[in-house]
Amino acid sequence: DPNKDSKYWSGFITNEELLVDKNFFKLLEKNGIIWGFVSGAESASAKFVLEKRLGLKSPPLISMGDAPDKPDPEGFIKLSKKLLGDKFGSSNIPIGYIGDTIADINTVINARKEIPSQKFISIGIAPPHLHLKSRLKERNSYEKKLQDAGADLILNSINELINVNLDLF
């Protein structure tokens, strides 16, 4: 119940496998990569995962209710403006979006339609439960669906992002 104090929360939100850890964000910052979150979860749930489980301090976040649901790009564009200012266009840095659903990939495709001069890159990754060795076949199938939906890149691990040159896309 998102209306309860999160110290009383239990279940999946408290023990779901996460794709990242706090060190990942420190590494992004060290490499000059600006980051934020667009979440389909309610604000309280998203903040619980980001702040309590990952230990991030007031991370940039657009959550359910802050913008229309994905694949509408409004939340993604709103967060990008918040992080970069209103500097969209071919002279701006590429903006990457990592997601684990087809709606995430379609959000990027729709952002390109809204601001065609800006380079938006869709990066797909399978959700945490498919990263188990026993689910490799399902994961491969899921990643193919992300690619077929239009993902520019599929990551096997979120940590691979550090080695990706987004200017190549």
Regions found by a protein language model. Give the residues of each.
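Structural signal for conserved beta-strand scaffold positions within catalytic alpha/beta enzyme cores
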Residues: I62-S63, G124, N156
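Short, acidic loop-to-helix structural element flanking the phosphoryl-transfer center
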Residues: D1-F37, A44-K47
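Substrate-recognition "cap/lid" segment bordering the active-site pocket of phosphatases
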Residues: W9, T14, G36-G96, I102-P116, ...
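Short amphipathic alpha-helix with an adjacent loop that forms part of the alpha/beta core around
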Residues: L84, L161-F169
